[in-house]
Amino acid sequence: MIDVRYRNRLGNRMFQYCLGRILAEELDFALQADALPGFPNTRQKIEGLSLEEPEQLLSGQKIDWDEVRADRSHRRIVLDGWFQRYEYYRPWRREIRQWLAIDPAVQAPEIKPGVVVHVRRTDYVQMRWALPFSYYDEALETLLPHGGPVWIVTDDSHDPFLRHFSKWKPKIFRGSPLETMLFMSRSSKLVLSQSTFGWWPAFLGDVESVACPLPQSGIWSAATEFPGIDLIERDRFICLPCTDYRPTRLESAHQLKRQVHRRLVEIAIRSLNLPLVLQPP
């Protein structure tokens, strides 16, 4: 049996589900994994060998991928990690696009020609994983040398950082996480942040050109505190080195205001004994 223990939010869980299903398919094991909301094919029951023990625990990012698949012994494999390495998934891209086909009830427009830019802010600013505008500007100049429509997907449409994009006259796309992911996957050109949420549309869609950061710090950097992550497809992406982001005073003030507001909302919700749901896409 393959037992998937989900961690964190949607983009991360998609890796965990797919790794579990790949192993189930290759080893002829049963798959135990909750369905991912909005992805109806993840409700499919995967039959196979189902044992409770002996147990093999896989965690972290990088695992001995070849050895795990070559071991045909009967066992229960528990997936309790992140597994964010494109080498595990790219050979299965055709199948994964079927497994993670978004519910047809979810709708989003197609923007062609033009480019969709994923600007991840909020928690990334606090963790120093946000990217500088110089990266986005270079990416847009590279993908749109003669100009064209620009759409921004972001988790904070009020962030003054977005004013840097004014010369591109961008439009802001607003939608649910699934609508946003579908919208990004339908673009012809895509600018990534160092985020799993943005990586998946580039993998699942038919995006012609993808600009990708090579950051000095953050989860996709060589200096990451989470070693083993490797989602940068250097043979497919246009990879652009970028410096660390340094917020302006206005941007810092905005982030402080956000944090104070969020804290007040949390206090109010807890005082009313309501469930706390504060998850930016």
Task: Please annotate each region the language model reported.
Residues 16-23:
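Short amphipathic alpha-helix
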Residues 2, 25-31, 208-210:
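Short helix-capping/linker segments at secondary-structure and domain boundaries
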Residues 6-15, 126-129:
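A short, glycine/small-residue-rich beta-strand->loop->alpha-helix junction that serves as a flexible
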Residues 27-40, 154:
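A short beta-strand-loop structural module common to alpha/beta enzyme folds
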Residues 171-175, 228-243:
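Short acidic-hydrophobic, aromatic-tinged amphipathic segments that line or gate anion-handling sites
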Residues 10, 144-228:
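Donor-binding and catalytic core of enzymes assembling or modifying cell-surface/extracellular glycoconjugates
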